[in-house]
Amino acid sequence: MGRTNFVKMRFIKIQATVLAAFFALSQFSTHAAPLVPGPNDGRIAYVTARLMEEYHYSQQPLDEEMSKKFFDGYLETLDPRHENFLQADLAEFSHWRTNLDTLTIGARGTADLTPAFQIYERFVERLQQHDAYVAELLKRDKFKFTGDDKILIDRRHSPYPKNLEAAKKLWDERLRYEYLQEKLSKEISPTNDAILPLPKNADAKIVDTLTHHYNWNFHMVTNWDSTDVLQAYLEALTHAYDPHSDYFNTEHAQDFSIDMSLSLFGIGAQLGEDDGYCTINSLIRGGPADKSNQLHEKDRIVAVAQGSKAAVSVVDMELGKVVQLIRGPKGTQVRLTISPMEDRALRKIVTLTRDEIKLEDSEAKARLIELPDGKGGTNRIGYIDLPSFYATIDLPGSSNHSVKSTTADVTKLINKLKQEKVAGIIIDLRTNPGGSLEEAVRFTGLFIKDGPVVLARNPDGEISKDNDPDPSVLYAGPLVIMINRFSASAAEIAAAALQDYGRALVVGDTSTFGKGTVQDLNPLRPFWPALSAATNDPGTVKITIRKFYRVSGASTQLKGVVPNIILPDVLNYSPDIGEASLENPLPWDTIPSASYDKLNLVQPYVTQLRERSDARVATNQDFIYIRQDIAEFKKLQADETATLNEHEALTERQTNEARQKARDKERSARKAPDEKIYAITVENAGESSLPAPEALTTTNYIATTNGIAFNVDSDFSKYFETNAASKNLKAKIRTEVKTLPPDPMLNETENILEDYISLMKKSDTLIANH
């Protein structure tokens, strides 16, 4: 498996920001007059900096050293692949590198934003040069891929090009690589592994594809306004303190609230971009768009109007800005000018009343699983997929959402599983990024008596405890928690507490993400008394204010939670996942342990459970495939280049395709799983009967997210009206998961839980007999 290996590329893609590919062609090679800061932008930057100095956990002043991190971070935000800025640009801007502190907080009350806007304008200038050069290459070059050239895929740690000639060499390599990838995708037969002859117009189609791609991406960058520049600049400032502090303008703050609340006020549509048009990808069931019966998938939105006001054209508008126009307070009207899929020349106006949209795909869900017991009967176990620790959060000026609570939803699901007499429960926290700390504490309290769940230390060194105040226990049976390298923050708190108490067995990757910090939201308006109520919202600053610790006293920062049983996974070998891979993380440390009543429900069985699991994993065919992928991934990690030789690349891709098809063939020949799965949702958990069992095939076990987070491109432009990338990623994962292979992690965890139940029963029998 070579440089075209998908596993490699999916890791590269997830790291790169959308800006990494924002180059252009001549269609958008002109740039409007230079941007200037908005009237309040300097004040916003000043207040943000002062809040970071005052409230951040590190208590670090914005000094010369922080200025260096601030400056470097801004360049990284704009040009993460180090292929547009020249070393001459860096030399020209170098006097700012140690002076951003003075420019930001030196003047009383207002920051000097000259560096932010001049650096951005230089970036656009370099993109225009990139534009002209790529356009020239596509017009005149007949690309040949017969030599031994290679391209360094990940340039994050490489120096910026020395001069324009060096930059052109990088641009040429990148374009040739992208051209080759397009060509390869057209050369392999979709039905077998044969190499197909290219059609006569193939080169022209590839040029058209790349032209459109570059045009659109460049347009998105040069379409920035002053708020976009300020957003990027203040992100660099806050990230200089740690990777989780942030500045949110109004749009980003709303997205954060929606992520936490799992609801928004809008029309209920999933939107995407297609050739410069905002396109309806799907309708959310029960939303205003769905109920209107006037909107359909693939319809284009060409203009948006608020109530009776004039319509605003949204053709070629950045998708996030279209989203902002469509969202609005509950009960208000929005008029959409639609170009229907069946007749693009037609224009029709659809008036919708905004309503609250529930994002049910992101809430907790359960499955009742019936497994054969080997004696002619069945064992019943429960499975709960918890994508995040969500909770209602209202920002100043926002309308009240209906109350949403992770703990309340999980309680309903567990009560239903208990009603169905499950012998044990699996809770899946894989790819759970965290969320509400309060919800994580309350969730943990469902499984333990009262006591501390998490410790926290503030900047003054004061240690506090977040306790479960409720002595009742909702579920006292066998419990297994699944984690992976993407389980973070509040998910780590819950997993760590249940592990420290000896209440749950933790299974999964080598460790969780390692985010052991707590953030607080600080709207800027209260710090700005003179700001008129009619003035646009100045934004919100998210600040890391505490570090949290396990009840054992160890931090989860950097090191994460190590499971009781580790399963093989390619994710275990990526250095680019986890807190340690981010810029400016806070260090790991310990504090004194809390006093808590430790249970002994796990440790007596861990050795036997691990031995049995290891024996199964050693011979399980899916884990054999995973170990093969791990070996290939290690080879890829050792060589970060990709070949530009067509024959070599095509052979590699053909080999990879053949390997995957052989695996698919082997899997399809397997006997269908001898189990029944019943889907339980928050909505149907209160019903007395179970729904019909799900149809199962050899390639469709339970839909979960483990190991497939990289099966989507980080540059995809599908948005719910939330425009929230993490949720879109999960939504796309969940819609595609049914075509993926079985989830061996979950299947093995089911086996582990069955062993755990059996061992606990034997132990109870021995105690009873004694």
Language model region names:
Residues M1-I12:
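N-terminal secretory signal peptides that target proteins for export/translocation
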Residues Q15-Q27:
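Bacterial N-terminal signal peptides
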Residues A32-P37, R50-D63, Y214, H219-S226, ...:
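Cleft-lining beta-strand/loop regions that shape enzyme active-site pockets
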Residues D41-A49, D63-L75, H82, L90, ...:
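Extracytoplasmic/secreted envelope proteins and their assembly/folding machinery
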Residues L62-K68, D72-K150, F218-E273, Q333-R335, ...:
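Extended, small/polar residue-biased N-terminal targeting/export presequences
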Residues E76-T77, T98, G109-D112, A116-A132, ...:
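PDZ/PDZ-like domain segments forming the peptide/carboxylate-binding groove
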Residues I153, Y177, Q181-N192, K200-H212, ...:
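Conserved functional hotspot residues or short segments at active or partner-binding sites
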Residues A490, G502, V507-I577:
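Polar, glycine-rich mid-to-C-terminal structural blocks
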